[in-house]
């Protein structure tokens, strides 16, 4: 039985109404992600009493979620030039309102509420703040939870959906013993304090029913060694980022479709490097789609080196030649083993009419990620590739350290 079935969550509509009224709600993320609940409220409605409640009962770090545009306007720089947070949380340098605005130490509930209110004031300038401080700004992704299923994005989305300034105040909820509160504890907490409680998964579904972040800008036929596919060009409505997908055949919306979500790999896909198994997986997926007569391959640009980029990927190759494995090399460079997000890929699949998938993957994380965006994986279809002398260790590390299933 899932948590959704076992526990009674509120509707997103109920949460939006409470946010509009200036109340807090609890937002819970996926059990396979952080598996925690945050107190969330609109920054526009923050008060010293609300900050005090978060500090007293939430006990976590009180943060201010802002849009990328607002972070730029206030000249809020990343806390570190190299973000190694496995979840990709974008912390900016902490701030306090300048003492000229009436703050003292910056840490009091009054001072923090004042800092937050000032940060969303239309007249605020970078010079209105001192750094470091006691309020921790977080930069949300432009597409909100449809791009990243995090509390940062959820808080901004809820404020925007409530018709308020798109910024949120969030605080993790811990138990009395200092450990993180999980869903059963959060349900008790919500009941005790009369708070609504929702999941990020439900917020994603709510938005998916009403909006999309991608638009198809062109389609054409693409002859390949495996048959004639259709290639579709997509553009992110907010960032302008471009992506492509290949399709063959047609399907009904309730029909499970053979799908491959493939991460960009210049060295493997284009230069046929033996260091990885990317090109063989790409070609095998196209072959399997052609054999089936229908299916989709989404090719995610920007996923080079599991999200670290081509230059860092080649730096990782250098380290591998010195004895580091692929995971150790990423960590030596200051990156988590895998930085990829699949929200845009999920949006493209939905636009192509896919709701149920037979997903061609060896990566269990990809299954969890795509299901988090409202798609159903009815079957995992393994892609079996014979190792070569150059990628044998690489494949073993993916199996042992990243949980890939071969």
Curated annotation (Swiss-Prot):
Domain of life of the native organism: Bacteria
Residues annotated as the enzyme's active site: 338, 340
Protein name: Riboflavin biosynthesis protein RibBA
InterPro entries noted in UniProt: DHBP_synth_RibB-like_a/b_dom (IPR017945), DHBP_synthase_RibB (IPR000422), GTP_cyclohydro_II (IPR032677), RibA (IPR000926), RibA-like_sf (IPR036144), Riboflavin_synth_RibBA (IPR016299)
Binding site for Mg(2+) 1: 34
Binding site for Zn(2+): 265, 276, 278
Assigned EC number: 4.1.99.12, 3.5.4.25
Catalytic activity, reaction form: D-ribulose 5-phosphate = (2S)-2-hydroxy-3-oxobutyl phosphate + formate + H(+); GTP + 4 H2O = 2,5-diamino-6-hydroxy-4-(5-phosphoribosylamino)-pyrimidine + formate + 2 phosphate + 3 H(+)
Site, as annotated: Essential for DHBP synthase activity: 134, 172
Pfam families recorded: DHBP_synthase (PF00926), GTP_cyclohydro2 (PF00925)
